[in-house]
Amino acid sequence: MAPPKLHTLFCLSGFLALVHPFDWRDLDPVTYIQSSVWIQRIQSELLITSFGHTTIPKGNGPYSVGCTDLMSGYTNQSSFLRLYYPSQDNDFPDALWIPNEEYFQGLTETLGASSFLGKLLKLLYGSVKVPAKWNSPLKTGEKYPLIIFSHGLGAFRSIYSAIGIELASHGFIVAAVEHRDESAAATYYFQDAPAAESGNRSWIYYKVGNLETEERKRQLRQRGEECSQALSWLLSIDEGEPVKNVLDLNFDIQQLKGSLDRSKVAIIGHSFGGATVIQTLSEDQRFRCGIALDPWMFPVGEDVHSKIPQPLFFINSEYFQSANDTKKIEKFYQPQKERKMIAVKGSVHHNFVDFTFATGKIIGQMLSLKGKIDSEVAMDLINKASLAFLQKYLGLDKNFDQWNSLMEGDDENLIPEFTIPTTMQSSTGTEQRNPD
């Protein structure tokens, strides 16, 4: 994920320019803007100028979806996950999309913007919910395939819910890792048990700056280790080992005992998370296959392609990948190895992220959160192609093979492998806007 483009959404010019101007020097802007009149004015102007929906789509599968957070222990060495899973009870509240004020602060610090912007973001998006039932009990009696999900640069565990919810609605348990490598906009841990009991969080924010290749590679190695660690912890829960969720939420973690199909484990990630998919597959053979969503290839090692025997699927946006990225991807195509690649026509890098649903058409396209393709159509293609791939290479007894043609790019809104346009990027892979 390229933070400058992602967070441009939250610049004041996107919506404050549309309301009646006032002189910020003569008042406290936060107090002023918190009046109900101004809240309604800003929100209504945002909706009027967006001309589109602002909700994250529900899952289309046969299962209801639950959601909870899990933390395996204390210190920043623990695993921190958002879990999406098939649920047996809908009589629970929907989960909060962005769960803490500090995440808004992290987004603004990633941008290098003022703290006021974070308060404004919280005002506008702090109460947004996702269509997954918070702490709803797991639907027991089945063994579910497991997906570990890795977020992009400047993101965090909860903002890929459109993907997590859709997969869970089709019978997967999805564990979205929140990385502690200073690539998340924000994350936290508890130093010890007293800190957890008192709610004293220790926060880690995005490491701002033009990081060199070696630092990105260090982060990538850590991310891969965190994905493997999350898998090991979930498998130990499945085995019935005594574990505790230090978040102490109203979710019985023992429900997960015996719930995983341990032979059917995959990894999915977007942008830096796509690079993490590649890194993790090269180090951990427990993952049977992987899906790299518009991967940020800059930190990927030159020889890692030779270390991945598992099937690998690249699903790209139309214009994010540079010519150098495509050359790196081509190296993964080797004899006797299962590789597939498609791109979603008219899509941009952030069509894979929930933020594509957080604003309507005009503002979304202006700020590169939406492409020319409808966001729901793009997400539907991404999810269906992923499901078809997962069925084929995890050996699932489902009906996802009805979408096998999507893996080959056989759709008017898809581009088959190696006919995908490339774009100009900076040396660190930051997306740049292409001329139409």
Curated annotation (Swiss-Prot):
<dbReference type="GO" id="GO:0090026">
    <property type="term" value="P:positive regulation of monocyte chemotaxis"/>
</dbReference>
<comment type="similarity">
    <text>Belongs to the AB hydrolase superfamily. Lipase family.</text>
</comment>
<dbReference type="InterPro" id="IPR016715">
    <property type="entry name" value="PAF_acetylhydro_eukaryote"/>
</dbReference>
<keyword id="KW-0595">Phospholipid degradation</keyword>
<dbReference type="GO" id="GO:0034638">
    <property type="term" value="P:phosphatidylcholine catabolic process"/>
</dbReference>
<keyword id="KW-0325">Glycoprotein</keyword>
<feature type="glycosylation site" description="N-linked (GlcNAc...) asparagine">
    <location>
        <position position="76"/>
    </location>
</feature>
<feature type="signal peptide">
    <location>
        <begin position="1"/>
        <end position="21"/>
    </location>
</feature>
<feature type="active site" description="Charge relay system">
    <location>
        <position position="294"/>
    </location>
</feature>
<feature type="active site" description="Nucleophile">
    <location>
        <position position="271"/>
    </location>
</feature>
<dbReference type="GO" id="GO:0034441">
    <property type="term" value="P:plasma lipoprotein particle oxidation"/>
</dbReference>
<feature type="active site" description="Charge relay system">
    <location>
        <position position="349"/>
    </location>
</feature>
<keyword id="KW-0345">HDL</keyword>
<dbReference type="GO" id="GO:0034364">
    <property type="term" value="C:high-density lipoprotein particle"/>
</dbReference>
<dbReference type="InterPro" id="IPR029058">
    <property type="entry name" value="AB_hydrolase_fold"/>
</dbReference>
<dbReference type="GO" id="GO:0003847">
    <property type="term" value="F:1-alkyl-2-acetylglycerophosphocholine esterase activity"/>
</dbReference>
<keyword id="KW-0378">Hydrolase</keyword>
<feature type="glycosylation site" description="N-linked (GlcNAc...) asparagine">
    <location>
        <position position="324"/>
    </location>
</feature>
<feature type="glycosylation site" description="N-linked (GlcNAc...) asparagine">
    <location>
        <position position="200"/>
    </location>
</feature>
<dbReference type="GO" id="GO:0034374">
    <property type="term" value="P:low-density lipoprotein particle remodeling"/>
</dbReference>
<keyword id="KW-0442">Lipid degradation</keyword>
<dbReference type="Pfam" id="PF03403">
    <property type="entry name" value="PAF-AH_p_II"/>
</dbReference>
<comment type="function">
    <text>Lipoprotein-associated calcium-independent phospholipase A2 involved in phospholipid catabolism during inflammatory and oxidative stress response. At the lipid-aqueous interface, hydrolyzes the ester bond of fatty acyl group attached at sn-2 position of phospholipids (phospholipase A2 activity). Specifically targets phospholipids with a short-chain fatty acyl group at sn-2 position. Can hydrolyze phospholipids with long fatty acyl chains, only if they carry oxidized functional groups.</text>
</comment>
<dbReference type="GO" id="GO:0005543">
    <property type="term" value="F:phospholipid binding"/>
</dbReference>
<dbReference type="GO" id="GO:0034362">
    <property type="term" value="C:low-density lipoprotein particle"/>
</dbReference>
<dbReference type="GO" id="GO:0047499">
    <property type="term" value="F:calcium-independent phospholipase A2 activity"/>
</dbReference>
<keyword id="KW-0443">Lipid metabolism</keyword>
<dbReference type="GO" id="GO:0046469">
    <property type="term" value="P:platelet activating factor metabolic process"/>
</dbReference>
<dbReference type="GO" id="GO:0034440">
    <property type="term" value="P:lipid oxidation"/>
</dbReference>
<protein>
    <recommendedName>
        <fullName>Platelet-activating factor acetylhydrolase</fullName>
        <ecNumber>3.1.1.47</ecNumber>
    </recommendedName>
</protein>
<dbReference type="GO" id="GO:0062234">
    <property type="term" value="P:platelet activating factor catabolic process"/>
</dbReference>
<keyword id="KW-0964">Secreted</keyword>
<keyword id="KW-1208">Phospholipid metabolism</keyword>
<keyword id="KW-0732">Signal</keyword>
